[in-house]
């Protein structure tokens, strides 16, 4: 058995590729069913965010298992092997474990140390459990990754002052406003006519950051009015005008800054829609943090409009990254230790079949000898006395097993453990059962 991760991220693929791999909530069950039906995949879970899609799996055979996951990604994305494979990464065993710990700790994020990824890793654990696709190995790995992510944020300063995708989007708007005025600085958004499209978690974070950057009023559009109004109620100090997506035309006409963050699988804004608007000197900035993208690529270059997507956030991220690199080194040291702990536990499982056979053999001997002893005691031996003798025999077996079992499972080089297992199997004449093969 081998642990593997196959996926892509903002580091390996542009948004136009990532959006084709994104798995929406409505398609997640089908994806789990497909992966669970794969013969080579023993356990599996899926991490799908705006910046990455990663499949974590316990596979029978490394090469065949990874190949099966790649075939799933081809089918899901509709991309050819030639278009997809250059953007994929594959990590195995220790590298896969370390990568997951880095992801959970925020070290592999577009925004170093951002906290939302930890919630997404928690969701990955929950999905794996809900669809009964993770067993003891991945469950242990994923839950330890969550605890590692928490530890990184509590034991280092990586999470302090970290920006998120949403806050980076707001900073990008401030930066572009400043640059349009000939200033390389973040400007207040107080005078901007702002609109947010979508009323999900990312939109909530957007509104929080917009309010903190000087925005006092905005328009909030969503497919359902109730959800938009419910979100608006959480910001009593902000003047929020709610509406439906049917009002998008009017919103485009009167806004100077629009953020999009919907779950739509197709763009809601494209060049055909915008071509009917004459902006004159009134520039409209469109910042899209949706994946798949909410704003079509053909919008770029239209007069009167500037469009940005999640890949454009790099400009803002770079301004904050340098000062955080030393903290990231501290976090990586912690991650290395957590990965080592898991890998030691994983390696110790090599001894489990031998330990189980040894315990089974000794248990058979215990029962046989106990039965002989009890039969010699005669009918006058009470039920209570029988229980005492049986407990005594079990205690002796457990005492005998404790030290060798502890030593067999202790951290040690694989070659040394294999040699110890051979010796135990030879001394106790432990055959290999079908369950161990």
From Swiss-Prot:
Q: Which residues form the active site?
A: 50
Top-level division of the source organism's lineage: Bacteria
- Listed binding positions for substrate are 49-52, 109, 114-116, 120
| One Pfam family it belongs to | Shikimate_DH
Q: What positions does the entry give for NADP(+) binding?
A: 198-203
Q: Which residues cross the membrane?
A: none
**Classification via PROSITE patterns:** GLUTR (PS00747)
Tell me which EC number(s) this protein carries: 1.2.1.70
**Which residues are annotated as site, described as Important for activity?**
99
- Keyword Repeat appears in the UniProt entry: no
One BP term from GO: chlorophyll biosynthetic process
- Please name the top-level EC class of this enzyme: oxidoreductase
Q: Which Gene3D superfamilies match?
A: Glutamyl-tRNA reductase, N-terminal domain (3.30.460.30), NAD(P)-binding Rossmann-like Domain (3.40.50.720)
Q: Name one GO molecular function term.
A: NADP binding
Miscellaneous comment text of the record: During catalysis, the active site Cys acts as a nucleophile attacking the alpha-carbonyl group of tRNA-bound glutamate with the formation of a thioester intermediate between enzyme and glutamate, and the concomitant release of tRNA(Glu). The thioester intermediate is finally reduced by direct hydride transfer from NADPH, to form the product GSA.
Family of the protein in this entry: Belongs to the glutamyl-tRNA reductase family.
Q: Which NCBIfam families match?
A: hemA (TIGR01035), PRK00045.1-3 (NF000744)
Cited HAMAP family: Glu_tRNA_reductase
Record text on subunit structure and interactions = Homodimer.
User: What is the name of this protein?
Assistant: Glutamyl-tRNA reductase
Q: What is the originating organism of this protein? A: Prochlorococcus marinus (strain SARG / CCMP1375 / SS120)
